[in-house]
């Protein structure tokens, strides 16, 4: 018969508060025993589908493990707390996952920390709608993957950061990340086909940033990154759009976007940035009238 997790929690709390670090007759360290009881309670709550209660019990178990300086087990237990909290209490899930990540980095386990930084970014982005925090998490993950020579994973994280930076209006950061991934991908036969998309996104960020001279220079710079970009529809679109921006012609801008979209469907990210650019053109038109 499975023990009542509530009773296990009470027993664990009493054990943790007991006097003395070790029992007199071979009982072991009180924090070790308390940790085991909290873990048993956590798994009991899981069986009962009580996610929040399980998360709290795992968190208490991790605290006991830290008291015995068992940082590796504590980090893994905080991850279990994160998994349990996530559905019902995403903010608590993010909090305990950050503790786990800090423990992993202190132990030099940056690959595992990067994996959980991606999870943390996803919580901030999807559940908590904290775009700035998500952006920072993805940036950290990319840097840690890169330091571990996991270039494909690093690029995936950098692209997540770039997308969010663009949507936040942090266009310079988005441009740096898109160009960084483009340069890293251009010599890889499996990844080279995606370079035109990264450069298109970087170009749109230049336009959204409102610096026409920088945009023209960027179009030349893109050909240095990938000379074959000159023959793509994406490059032609950027050139056409820049012409309409310099002419302050919102209708022509919309026509060029529509024509491109007929053959290459625009995703929601590009559509959002394009609408921002079009709005800027319309404001410029209004200023001229």
Curated annotation (Swiss-Prot):
Organism, scientific name: Schizosaccharomyces pombe (strain 972 / ATCC 24843)
Residues modified to Phosphoserine: 76
UniProt keyword list: ER-Golgi transport, Membrane, Phosphoprotein, Protein transport, Transport
Family to which this protein belongs: Belongs to the SNAP family.
Gene Ontology annotations of biological process type: endoplasmic reticulum to Golgi vesicle-mediated transport; intracellular protein transport; SNARE complex disassembly; vacuole fusion, non-autophagic
Record's function text: Required for vesicular transport between the endoplasmic reticulum and the Golgi apparatus.
Membrane topology: Peripheral membrane protein
Residue stretches spanning the membrane: none
Identification of the protein by name: Probable vesicular-fusion protein sec17 homolog
Highest taxon listed in the record's lineage: Eukaryota
């Amino acid at each position: 018969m499975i023990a009542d997790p509530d009773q296990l929690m009470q027993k664990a709390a009493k054990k943790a508060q007991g006097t003395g670090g070790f029992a007199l007759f071979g009982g072991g360290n009180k924090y070790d025993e308390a940790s085991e009881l909290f873990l048993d309670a956590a798994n009991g709550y899981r069986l009962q589908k009580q996610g929040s209660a399980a998360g709290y019990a795992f968190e208490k178990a991790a605290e006991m493990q830290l008291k015995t300086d068992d940082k590796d087990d504590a980090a893994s237990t905080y991850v279990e707390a994160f998994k349990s909290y996530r559905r019902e209490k995403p903010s608590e899930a993010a909090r305990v996952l950050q503790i786990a990540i800090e423990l992993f980095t202190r132990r030099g386990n940056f690959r595992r920390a990067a994996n959980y930084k991606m999870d943390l970014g996803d919580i901030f982005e999807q559940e908590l709608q904290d775009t700035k925090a998500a952006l920072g998490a993805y940036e950290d993950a990319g840097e840690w993957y890169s330091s571990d020579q996991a270039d494909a994973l690093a690029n995936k994280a950098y692209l997540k950061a770039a997308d969010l930076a663009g949507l936040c209006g942090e266009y310079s950061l988005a441009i740096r990340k898109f160009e960084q991934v483009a340069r890293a991908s251009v010599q890889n036969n499996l990844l080279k086909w995606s370079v035109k998309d990264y450069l298109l996104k970087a170009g749109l960020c230049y336009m959204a940033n409102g610096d026409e001279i920088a945009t023209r220079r960027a179009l030349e710079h893109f050909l240095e990154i990938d000379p074959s970009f000159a023959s793509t529809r994406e490059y032609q679109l950027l050139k056409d759009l820049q012409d309409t921006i310099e002419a302050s012609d919102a209708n022509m801008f919309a026509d060029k976007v529509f024509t491109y979209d007929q053959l290459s469907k625009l995703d929601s990210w590009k559509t959002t940035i394009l609408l921002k650019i079009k709005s800027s053109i319309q404001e410029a038109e209004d200023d001229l009238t």
